[in-house]
């Protein structure tokens, strides 16, 4: 794990905060100013003006948060110390963390694929076959939410998603025509996500450093979601090749996408009490600060290239949360909706049903076995 962390540090480097690698941010969002000239780009996505937010009882007014961005270097130092003596494995590896009535990892994976396709279409993506591996990538980015996968197992192919290894996905992205430097960026953001999510689950001392600090919590939370890597591939699906470590628009879109989701989850009543709740503490004040940050990210995107894609992606949480089964299952008491036959037909092509080489030892139980089993559908 320490080797992975050091590799990430070398790739990303520091952002505007010295000592922040690999949790790099190029832009200091506390200092963002409203663009001087508004463009018609504000018509893309869901635009809720800051002065109109109090009209909605599930929203309210805004307030600038105290800047805690510089504290990210302290978080890095904490993680460095933890990794010095961290065990190679944890007893909870491959534990299902969805909080729902899942029977096994294979079932979780099917539901993750359902959720992936749902997110993608809300972001504005197409289910065209040429996006197959981009969708598998998003699924890989979603699985650590619901299963505690060790990053090493993800990288070396011990863990497979519906029969697909990470190397399969890498080769597939290149075959779909995604430029190699964009594939590398997407790969490294996914490695970073796997590492930060795993550390968040196994290090009991990390969360206390983040709670009640809106900008610091946001910095870490966006890394665990990997919305930046997903945005890179969404743009690639539209033939738009952008994205490097200095791309402020990608940063702001990835931040706003997480914030729009949290705002909608709070409106739906499913944010409070989450293990990784972003507004735990003085919830009323922290929600005001979160909305302040969201508004400024969206205003920044108004003046950026490709706003027609990025603003929809950034604000999409406001409409996918109340519509997607993933979140409605939480309203239902964390009970899964059965997979209907029509859904199973959509999911079937994403399952690799050829035999998968087995491995000896404890890893053998964690290679996806669904490859030879039909999808169970609701009658």
Curated annotation (Swiss-Prot):
E.C. number, please?
A: 4.2.3.104
| Top EC category | lyase
> What is one process in the GO biological process aspect for this record?
terpenoid biosynthetic process
User: Which keywords accompany this UniProt record?
Assistant: Lyase, Magnesium
Q: Is this entry keyworded Acyltransferase?
A: no
State the practical use: Eupenifeldin is a bistropolone-humulene meroterpenoid first discovered as an antitumor and anti-leukemia agent. This metabolite also shows anthelmintic activity against the parasitic worm Hemonchus contortus, anti-malarial activity as well as antifungal activity.
**Disrupted-gene phenotype:** Abolishes the production of humulene.
Which pathway does the database say it acts in?
Secondary metabolite biosynthesis; terpenoid biosynthesis
**Catalyses which reaction?**
(2E,6E)-farnesyl diphosphate = alpha-humulene + diphosphate
The cofactor named in the record is:
Mg(2+)
Q: Does the keyword Magnesium apply?
A: yes
Which GO MF term does the entry hold, naming one?
alpha-humulene synthase activity
- Recorded family membership: Belongs to the terpene synthase family. Alpha-humulene synthase eupE subfamily.
Role? Alpha-humulene synthase; part of the gene cluster that mediates the biosynthesis of eupenifeldin, a bistropolone meroterpenoid that acts as an antitumor agent. The first step of eupenifeldin biosynthesis is the biosynthesis of 3-methylorcinaldehyde performed by the non-reducing polyketide synthase eupA. Oxidative dearomatization of 3-methylorcinaldehyde likely catalyzed by the FAD-dependent monooxygenase eupB is followed by oxidative ring expansion by the 2-oxoglutarate-dependent dioxygenase eupC to provide the first tropolone metabolite, tropolone stipitaldehyde.
- Entry protein name: Alpha-humulene synthase eupE
Which species is this UniProt entry from?
A: Phoma sp
């Amino acid at each position: 794990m320490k080797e992975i962390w050091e590799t990430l540090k070398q790739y990303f480097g520091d952002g505007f905060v010295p000592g922040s690698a690999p949790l790099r941010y190029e832009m200091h969002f506390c200092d963002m100013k409203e663009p001087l000239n508004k463009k018609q780009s504000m018509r893309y996505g869901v635009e809720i003006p800051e002065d109109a937010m109090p009209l909605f009882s599930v929203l309210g007014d805004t307030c600038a948060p105290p800047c805690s961005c510089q504290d990210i270097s302290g978080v890095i130092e904490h993680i460095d110390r933890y990794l010095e003596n961290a065990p190679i494995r944890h007893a909870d590896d491959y534990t299902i963390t969805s909080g729902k009535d899942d029977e096994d990892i294979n079932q979780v994976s099917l539901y993750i694929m359902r959720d992936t396709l749902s997110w993608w279409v809300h972001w504005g993506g197409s289910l065209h076959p040429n996006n197959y591996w981009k969708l598998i990538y998003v699924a890989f980015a979603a699985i650590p939410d619901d299963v505690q996968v060790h990053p090493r197992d993800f990288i070396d192919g011990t863990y497979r998603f519906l029969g697909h290894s990470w190397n399969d996905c890498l080769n597939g992205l290149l075959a779909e025509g995604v430029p190699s430097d964009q594939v590398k960026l997407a790969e490294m953001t996914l490695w970073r996500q796997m590492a930060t999510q795993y550390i968040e689950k196994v290090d009991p001392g990390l969360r206390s450093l983040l709670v009640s600090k809106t900008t610091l919590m946001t910095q870490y939370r966006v890394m665990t979601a990997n919305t930046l890597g997903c945005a890179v591939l969404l743009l690639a699906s539209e033939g738009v090749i952008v994205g490097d470590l200095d791309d402020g628009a990608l940063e702001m879109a990835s931040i706003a996408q997480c914030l729009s989701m949290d705002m909608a989850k709070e409106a739906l009543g499913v944010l409070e009490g989450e293990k990784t709740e972003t507004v735990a503490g003085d919830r009323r004040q922290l929600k005001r600060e979160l909305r302040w940050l969201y508004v400024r990210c969206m205003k920044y995107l108004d003046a950026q290239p490709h706003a027609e894609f990025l603003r929809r992606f950034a604000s999409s949480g406001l409409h996918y949360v109340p519509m997607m089964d993933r979140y409605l299952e939480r309203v239902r008491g964390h009970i899964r909706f059965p997979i209907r036959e029509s859904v199973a037909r959509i999911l079937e092509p994403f399952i690799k049903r050829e035999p998968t080489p087995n491995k000896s030892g404890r890893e053998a139980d964690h290679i996806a076995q669904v490859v030879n089993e039909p999808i169970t559908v609701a009658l």
